[in-house]
Swiss-Prot record:
SUPFAM superfamilies: lambda repressor-like DNA-binding domains (SSF47413)
Family matches, as PROSITE patterns: HTH_CROC1
Keywords: DNA-binding, Transcription, Transcription regulation
All residue ranges annotated as the HTH cro/C1-type domain in the record: 125-180
InterPro entries: Arc_TR_HTH, Cro/C1-type_HTH, Lambda_DNA-bd_dom_sf
Gene3D superfamilies assigned: lambda repressor-like DNA-binding domains (1.10.260.40)
Gene Ontology molecular function: any one: DNA binding
One Pfam family recorded for the sequence: HTH_3
DNA-binding region, residues: 136-155
Descriptive protein name: Putative HTH-type transcriptional regulatory protein SSO0942
């Protein structure tokens, strides 16, 4: 992690008196979450001076979509006023751009593989078009695009080039321009787990995912943070599941950091215990715990019956 960038991020948060917590697990390897910000919506922050990995992006996407919020990757690789969209709800931004976000300024330019676009507020576009009596054909002709493009703009399936945005502003005013981050949050998109390994006695995590999914629960695997799984029930209640490691001290650190992550993302923490010594320790600390051979009780708890409080 770049000390310089992390210091900039913390200075920005301290200056605006934001409440945040540092996630300090794993300690000596790459991790997907550095900071969780407690704003009007919890926000995940990953600080990186080099290229972020696919696994980091995958974790950030899963947590952000599951918790209906944004993941921000703060990096020097981005330009000040342009956001790079890495995945659903995952946005890369410069330290200067991050400061603008924290200050409540609108960031409306974003980059994808297809080029640079401007975020528009589709619901305002449709409302103003109808209010002013324009047909879809009228607007398409004025902008020099197809009728299908206007349908896509109004459904929120497509944003616009700089040239088209200028014409839209001329026609409807600048309040049609949106915010790349906060107007892009996807809340109901189902994330499909990619490549979950076949379970075996040695692969307890894969076995757990299989059993949870078999019971009709949505379970997503995390690889580079303190929680191992995100689980959601049919009522959209969220659980962060953390599995005991072989190393006692690392496990205790992992549980503590997972508790912070759960608290800031408004999720319930559940710990899977694999040794009797750790079971007593965790119960004494007030953690909700289940033994690894008691998965059915964990499933009952998440589905609303027969749980036990550790």
């Amino acid at each position: 992690m770049s000390k310089k960038i992390i210091d900039e991020v913390i200075d920005i948060l301290e200056d605006k008196k934001y409440t945040y917590t540092m996630i300090e697990y794993p300690e000596h390897n790459r991790k997907s979450v550095d900071i969780v910000l407690n704003s009007k919506e919890p926000t995940l922050i990953r600080v990186s001076e080099d290229k972020i990995t696919k696994e980091e992006i995958s974790d950030l996407k899963k947590i952000a979509v599951s918790t209906l919020t944004a993941s921000l990757v703060v990096t020097n690789e981005e330009e000040e006023d342009i956001v790079s969209v890495k995945a659903d709800n995952v946005f890369a931004i410069s330290p200067e751009g991050f400061k603008k976000v924290i200050n409540g300024e609108k960031i409306f330019l974003y980059r994808t593989r297809g080029g640079i676009f401007i975020k528009i507020r589709n619901y305002i576009l449709k409302h103003k078009r109808e209010e002013m009596g324009y047909s879809i054909g009228d607007v398409a002709k004025f902008l020099g695009v197809s009728r299908k493009a206007i349908y896509d703009y109004e459904k929120g399936d497509s944003d616009v080039s700089l040239e088209v945005a200028e014409k839209l502003i001329d026609l409807f005013g600048d309040d049609i321009i949106g915010d790349v981050i906060w107007d892009s949050i996807k809340s109901k998109k189902e994330i499909l787990e990619e490549g979950v390994a076949e379970f075996s006695p040695e692969n307890f995590k894969a076995k757990l995912i299989y059993k949870l999914k078999e019971s009709g629960l949505n379970a997503l695997s995390l690889k580079l943070t303190a929680a191992d799984l995100i689980v959601k029930d049919s009522d959209n209640n969220r659980y962060l599941v953390t599995i005991e490691n072989k190393d006692y001290n690392k496990s205790m650190k992992k549980f503590y950091e997972a508790k912070k992550l759960a608290s800031y993302t408004k999720s319930e923490l559940v710990i899977i215990i694999r040794t009797s010594k750790m079971l007593k320790e965790c119960e004494d600390l007030g953690y909700k715990t289940y033994e690894e051979n008691d998965i059915h009780s964990l499933i009952d708890e998440i589905k609303g019956s027969n749980g036990r409080q550790g």
